[in-house]
């Protein structure tokens, strides 16, 4: 990533985190913006969201985010419209890194426990 795309991604992550915290209704599981990746033409922003909840809640939350993309983009536009000519399209993805880390930790503990 270039310096510009990194700066844009960082700004988008900060602003989207604020939107998730303050402006979106909290009816489902806890969601946090983990990472934002922006294409080199700044046209698409891939937003990785960590969702704490059951499998069904996570799927519902991602579907809800994908349905509300236009609304979230409108809120984002109100915050950063003076810094960009064009607000990037948003694509939401579930970040499962925390879940994978827990699984690896459990496997390591099991392996150490059985080797004694």
Curated annotation (Swiss-Prot):
GO terms for cellular component: cytosol. It is found in: Cytoplasm. Its main location: cytoplasm. GO terms for biological process: maturation of SSU-rRNA. One of its GO terms (molecular function) is ribosomal small subunit binding. Coiled coil: none annotated. It comes from the Bacteria. The keyword RNA-binding does not apply. Keywords: Cytoplasm, Ribosome biogenesis. It holds the Pfam family RBFA. Disulfide bonds: none annotated. Transmembrane segments: none annotated. One of several proteins that assist in the late maturation steps of the functional core of the 30S ribosomal subunit. Associates with free 30S ribosomal subunits (but not with 30S subunits that are part of 70S ribosomes or polysomes). Required for efficient processing of 16S rRNA. May interact with the 5'-terminal helix region of 16S rRNA. Belongs to the RbfA family. Monomer. Binds 30S ribosomal subunits, but not 50S ribosomal subunits or 70S ribosomes. This is Ribosome-binding factor A. The lineage of its organism: Bacteria, Pseudomonadati, Chlorobiota, Chlorobiia, Chlorobiales.
């Amino acid at each position: 990533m270039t310096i510009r795309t990194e700066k844009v991604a960082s700004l988008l992550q900060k602003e989207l985190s604020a939107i998730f915290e303050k402006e979106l209704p909290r009816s489902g599981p806890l969601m946090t913006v983990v990472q934002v990746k922006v294409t080199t033409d700044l046209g698409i922003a891939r937003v990785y969201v960590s969702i704490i909840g059951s499998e069904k809640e996570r799927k519902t939350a991602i579907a809800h985010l994908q349905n509300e993309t236009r609304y979230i983009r409108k809120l984002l536009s109100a915050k950063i419209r003076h810094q960009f000519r064009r607000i990037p399209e948003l694509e939401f993805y579930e970040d499962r890194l925390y879940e994978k880390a827990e699984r690896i930790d459990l496997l390591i503990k099991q392996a150490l426990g059985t080797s004694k």
